[in-house]
Amino acid sequence: VNLTVLCPHFDPDLAPTGVVMSRIAHEFVERGHRLHVVTALPWYVRHDVEPGWEGRLVRTERTDWGRISRVHPFPTDKRNIPARALAFGGFTTLATLVGASARERPDAVLAMSPPLTLGPAGRVVAGLRRAPLVFNIQDVFPDVAVELGLLTGARVIALARRLERMSYRAADAVTVLSDDLADNVRGKIAAGLPTDAAERQRAKVRVIPNFVDTDRIRPGDRDNDYRLEFELIGSRVVMYAGNVGFSQSLDLVIEAARRLVDSHPDVVFVINGGGSARPELERAAGHSPNIRFVDMQPIERLPEVLAAADVHVVPLRTGLAWSSVPSKLYSILAAGRPLVASVDEGTEVARTVVRAGAGVAVPPDDADAFVAALLGVLEDPAAAERMGAAGRRFVEGWASPAAVAEAYEGLFTELVDRSGQDPRSG
C-alpha cells in the first residue's frame, strides 16, 4: 500500500517516538509498502533545529521507498503553553499542507500524537484522499499537561478535551500502547453518545504496544566504555536514561542521592539525557559528588548505556502512569537490568514490573519508599541478578518490531477493505 505518515519526529531525530516510528517505517518498507513521511526537521536533542537543517520551512528527501517531507517545528519552551500552542499550530499547518498536496494518493494515513493536533491534520489529509485514518496515541493529551499543571484554566482545558474527543472520533481507528490507555480513550470517545454510537466508537480503539528490539538490546558488561568514559568504574550506578522532562519525578532521584551521599559514597546517580527540566535539576543537584549529568548519547550506544547501570529508575509523577507508558521500560528489561519504578499502583508500568519479576514498584513521589527500594536492590546483588534475568525472559516474548508492523499492516488492510478502496488504484 501507499502510506502517508504524520509524526513529530523521524530518523535522524533521537526522540523516543521518532525512534519508534522510524523502525516501524523500516519494517513497512521491508514488507514492500511505499511511504510518504511528513515530520519535523530534527530538533529534539538541542530543542532547536539541528545545524545543517536550518533555513527552510520545508525540506524534501527522495528515498528508494518513497519520500520524507520535513517541516519547521517552531520549537519553544514547553512551559510556555501559549507559545507552544502557536508552535504546534504552525507545525501542524505546514504538515497538513504538505501531506494534502502530495501527488501520491495514500491508501491509508497514520498520524501520531502528541501533538494532538496531528489528529485533525491526519483527518484532513485522509479525507481529501478518501483514505482511512489511524490515529496512534503515544501519550494521552491533554491529561499529561493537566496533571503537570502546564495546562490550566477551565475553558482552556475544556477546549483541549473537545479537540481530543473530536480527534478520536474523526479517526477510523485509534491505537494505544496499553489496556490502561485503551480504557482512558474509550471512556472519552464514547462520552455523551447514544448507546449504539458509543459502542461503535469504543470498538475503534485497538491496543498495539510499542516494540522492543531484543536482538539489538541485550545484556552486556557493566564495566564498559561508557563507564570508563564517565569515570563510573568501581561505582554502583543508579541510572535514569531518557528525556529529562517535567513528566518524570527526577527531583526524587536528586533527593535519593542527597540521602545516600554520606552513607553510601560508592553509589552514583546518573541522569543520562536532555530536556526542558534538566537546567532546573542541575541547579538542585548543585555540586553533589554522587550525581552525574550525561548528555544524550547516540542511539547506537543505547545498549551500552543501559548495560552500565546496576539498577534503572522509572519515576513518573502522580497520575501520569495512567496516560503514559515510557518505552524505556521495555528497553531496560531487554538489557537485563533490574529497575525501581515510582508510579501509580495498578497501572501498566507497575503491573509489568511485578508480572515480570524485574524489580520493585513503589508509589509515586514517595522518597522513603523509593530510597528503600533502591537499597533493597543494590544491597542484594544476587536478587538484582535474578530480577534482571527475569525481565529479559519476560521481554523476549514481547512485541518485536516486525510483529508491531504486522499488526498495523493488518489494521490498514482491514480499514482499506472496509472502505472498498483498491490499494492498486493509488
List PLM regions with ranges:
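N-terminal subdomain of nucleotide-sugar transferases
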Residues: 1-62, 260, 402, 425
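Carbohydrate-associated surface elements
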Residues: 41, 180, 211
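A short helix/loop element that forms part of the nucleotide-sugar donor recognition site in Leloir-type
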Residues: 51-58, 190-195, 218-231
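Membrane-proximal helix-turn-helix segments that form the acceptor-binding/catalytic region
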Residues: 100, 117-120, 124-128, 154-176
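Conserved donor-binding/catalytic core segment of Leloir-type glycosyltransferases
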Residues: 212, 232-248, 254-258, 270
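Nucleotide-sugar-dependent
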Residues: 248, 296-307, 312-333, 339-351
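Nucleotide-activated donor-binding/catalytic signature segment of Leloir-type glycosyltransferases, i.e.
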Residues: 264, 278-303
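A charged, aromatic-enriched C-terminal amphipathic alpha-helix characteristic of glycosyltransferases
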Residues: 365, 369, 379-412
